[in-house]
Amino acid sequence: MPTWIIIVIIIFSLLTLFVVLSYLKLKKATNDTGSFNLLHLSDSDFQKTISKGVTLVDFWADWCMPCKLLGPTISNLADNNADKAKVAKLNIETYQKIAAINGISSIPTVVVFKNGKEVERSVSVKPKHYYQSMIDKALNK
Protein backbone atom coordinates (compact mmCIF):
# COMPACT_ATOMS: atom_id res chain seq x y z
CA MET A 1 0.00 0.00 0.00
CA PRO A 2 1.41 3.43 -0.94
CA THR A 3 2.56 5.69 1.87
CA TRP A 4 0.21 8.53 0.91
CA ILE A 5 -2.84 6.28 1.35
CA ILE A 6 -1.67 5.31 4.84
CA ILE A 7 -1.18 9.00 5.70
CA VAL A 8 -4.68 9.87 4.43
CA ILE A 9 -6.21 7.03 6.46
CA ILE A 10 -4.38 8.16 9.61
CA ILE A 11 -5.44 11.80 9.14
CA PHE A 12 -9.05 10.77 8.48
CA SER A 13 -9.04 8.52 11.56
CA LEU A 14 -7.68 11.28 13.78
CA LEU A 15 -10.21 13.76 12.45
CA THR A 16 -13.04 11.30 13.06
CA LEU A 17 -11.82 10.65 16.60
CA PHE A 18 -11.67 14.41 17.28
CA VAL A 19 -15.24 14.93 16.02
CA VAL A 20 -16.62 12.02 18.06
CA LEU A 21 -14.86 13.14 21.25
CA SER A 22 -16.04 16.73 20.77
CA TYR A 23 -19.61 15.55 20.31
CA LEU A 24 -19.48 13.36 23.42
CA LYS A 25 -18.06 16.22 25.48
CA LEU A 26 -20.81 18.57 24.30
CA LYS A 27 -23.49 15.96 24.92
CA LYS A 28 -22.37 15.65 28.56
CA ALA A 29 -22.20 19.42 29.02
CA THR A 30 -24.66 21.00 31.36
CA ASN A 31 -26.74 24.05 30.58
CA ASP A 32 -26.00 25.57 33.98
CA THR A 33 -22.55 26.39 35.31
CA GLY A 34 -23.76 26.97 38.85
CA SER A 35 -23.94 30.75 39.14
CA PHE A 36 -25.56 31.87 42.40
CA ASN A 37 -26.98 34.89 40.57
CA LEU A 38 -28.72 32.87 37.85
CA LEU A 39 -32.46 32.44 38.44
CA HIS A 40 -34.34 29.31 37.40
CA LEU A 41 -37.91 30.30 36.61
CA SER A 42 -41.13 28.31 36.83
CA ASP A 43 -44.85 28.87 36.22
CA SER A 44 -45.23 30.20 39.73
CA ASP A 45 -42.53 32.89 39.65
CA PHE A 46 -42.10 33.87 35.99
CA GLN A 47 -44.50 36.83 35.93
CA LYS A 48 -43.37 38.18 39.30
CA THR A 49 -39.69 37.97 38.29
CA ILE A 50 -40.07 39.84 35.00
CA SER A 51 -42.54 42.43 36.33
CA LYS A 52 -39.96 44.78 37.91
CA GLY A 53 -36.75 46.02 36.36
CA VAL A 54 -34.79 44.42 33.54
CA THR A 55 -34.76 40.63 33.20
CA LEU A 56 -32.99 38.58 30.54
CA VAL A 57 -34.60 35.14 30.14
CA ASP A 58 -32.98 32.23 28.31
CA PHE A 59 -35.64 29.79 27.04
CA TRP A 60 -33.94 26.40 26.68
CA ALA A 61 -34.31 22.59 26.78
CA ASP A 62 -32.06 19.74 27.94
CA TRP A 63 -31.87 18.14 24.49
CA CYS A 64 -30.81 21.38 22.74
CA MET A 65 -27.07 21.38 21.96
CA PRO A 66 -26.92 25.12 21.12
CA CYS A 67 -28.63 25.76 24.48
CA LYS A 68 -25.84 23.87 26.20
CA LEU A 69 -23.28 26.02 24.38
CA LEU A 70 -25.09 29.16 25.54
CA GLY A 71 -25.37 28.04 29.19
CA PRO A 72 -21.97 29.31 30.42
CA THR A 73 -22.52 32.66 28.69
CA ILE A 74 -25.87 33.13 30.43
CA SER A 75 -24.34 32.21 33.81
CA ASN A 76 -21.54 34.70 33.21
CA LEU A 77 -24.06 37.42 32.33
CA ALA A 78 -25.90 36.68 35.59
CA ASP A 79 -22.73 37.23 37.58
CA ASN A 80 -21.70 40.36 35.67
CA ASN A 81 -25.13 42.02 35.95
CA ALA A 82 -26.21 40.95 39.44
CA ASP A 83 -26.37 44.55 40.68
CA LYS A 84 -28.42 45.98 37.80
CA ALA A 85 -30.49 43.29 36.03
CA LYS A 86 -31.85 39.79 36.60
CA VAL A 87 -30.70 36.92 34.40
CA ALA A 88 -32.82 33.78 34.33
CA LYS A 89 -33.47 30.51 32.54
CA LEU A 90 -36.75 28.77 31.79
CA ASN A 91 -36.90 25.15 30.63
CA ILE A 92 -39.51 25.04 27.85
CA GLU A 93 -40.03 21.29 28.27
CA THR A 94 -41.05 21.68 31.89
CA TYR A 95 -42.93 24.97 31.51
CA GLN A 96 -44.53 24.70 28.08
CA LYS A 97 -47.38 27.06 28.92
CA ILE A 98 -45.02 29.97 29.67
CA ALA A 99 -43.07 29.23 26.48
CA ALA A 100 -46.29 29.23 24.44
CA ILE A 101 -47.55 32.46 26.00
CA ASN A 102 -44.25 34.12 25.06
CA GLY A 103 -44.30 32.78 21.49
CA ILE A 104 -41.21 30.62 21.82
CA SER A 105 -40.96 28.45 18.69
CA SER A 106 -37.18 28.02 18.39
CA ILE A 107 -34.49 27.59 20.99
CA PRO A 108 -32.34 28.94 22.32
CA THR A 109 -34.39 32.12 22.50
CA VAL A 110 -33.24 34.94 24.74
CA VAL A 111 -35.79 37.61 25.65
CA VAL A 112 -35.20 40.82 27.58
CA PHE A 113 -38.14 42.14 29.59
CA LYS A 114 -38.43 45.54 31.23
CA ASN A 115 -41.14 45.97 33.84
CA GLY A 116 -43.01 42.97 32.46
CA LYS A 117 -42.89 43.99 28.80
CA GLU A 118 -40.72 42.37 26.14
CA VAL A 119 -38.22 44.86 24.75
CA GLU A 120 -35.91 42.64 22.69
CA ARG A 121 -35.58 39.05 21.49
CA SER A 122 -32.78 36.98 19.99
CA VAL A 123 -32.96 33.47 18.54
CA SER A 124 -29.87 31.22 18.29
CA VAL A 125 -26.47 31.49 19.95
CA LYS A 126 -24.78 34.88 19.84
CA PRO A 127 -21.59 36.18 21.51
CA LYS A 128 -21.74 37.40 25.10
CA HIS A 129 -21.36 41.07 24.12
CA TYR A 130 -24.55 40.83 22.04
CA TYR A 131 -26.61 39.77 25.07
CA GLN A 132 -24.86 42.34 27.24
CA SER A 133 -25.86 45.06 24.77
CA MET A 134 -29.47 43.83 24.97
CA ILE A 135 -29.38 44.29 28.75
CA ASP A 136 -27.64 47.68 28.50
CA LYS A 137 -30.19 48.99 25.97
CA ALA A 138 -33.08 47.94 28.21
CA LEU A 139 -31.47 49.59 31.23
CA ASN A 140 -31.05 52.86 29.33
CA LYS A 141 -34.64 53.03 28.00
Regions found by a protein language model. Give the residues of each.
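Short active-site neighborhood of thiol/selenol oxidoreductases, capturing the structured segment around
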Residues: I50-D62
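N-terminal targeting signals for export/organelle localization
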Residues: M1-S35
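The canonical Cys-X-X-Cys-His
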Residues: C64-C67, V110
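Hydrophobic beta-strand anchors of alpha/beta hydrolase catalytic cores
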Residues: L56-V57, V87, V110
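Non-catalytic, surface beta->alpha helical segment in thiol-disulfide oxidoreductase systems
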Residues: S106, V111-K141
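Short acidic-hydrophobic, aromatic-tinged amphipathic segments that line or gate anion-handling sites
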Residues: L38-S44
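Typically the conserved alpha-helix immediately C-terminal to a functionally engaged Cys/Sec
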Residues: P66-A82
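Structural microenvironment flanking redox-active thiols in thiol-disulfide oxidoreductases
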Residues: A88-A100
